[in-house]
Amino acid sequence: MPAKAVPAPESAIKRAAHKVQQTENFRKAVAANKAEKTKLKKTAYLRGLKYSRAYRATEAKLVTQRRQAKSHGNFFQEAKAKIAVVTRIRGIAKVAPKQRKVLQLIRLRQIFNTVLVKLNKPMQNMLRLVEPYIAYGYPSLKTVRGLLYKRGHLKINGQRVKIQDNKQIKDKFNNEDIVCIEDMVNQIFTVGKHFRTVTNGMWPFKLSPPKGGMRQKRRHFVEGGDFGNRESLINKFLVRCI
């Protein structure tokens, strides 16, 4: 007579069922994550397109206004900058306590740390106070993009995490206005309503020493040195650092 089949232990059956359920849950999670990333990719593309059109329209309007002013023999008054990019170019040696405190407030604790700040009156006063230790100016859209794409790191659970995909950004900010890196670029470059949220959600950018080296750190930029306000010329400096 054939031997009777020995039934599997109940614990083994439960383990097998649990493993099947885990596999199915994992498969569903992977599928859901893939679908979310696909949807987010489409959203990011459409928003990037919208922002690009807005940037081009703004630039075209400025070009027209400059031409009209020139044709009438007038001087076109450029709008005041709303944002500044600030890079620390000197170390800690011989820094006065008050200046050290200001550098800490604007998160420039190390040499070649860089931040993007709203250029209001209090910030202008702080920048003047620590001017011998910084190079700053008015960033172009290309510079803001370069900083975020190449050197951007988010604050996630106290850790410094490199920006690698838009899902990181969506999960970090949990805000429908900030779901992709182009949203971050737009909020910063246009000084949007979430400017502070975005900048505070990132670590200061850590840049490299400029290719070709510095000129004279202890002399003002207008005197052939390095420190101080470079206005739009800061972009050429940062290209060498990013």
Please identify what each model-predicted range represents:
Residues M1-I242:
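Core subunits and conserved enzymes of cellular information-processing
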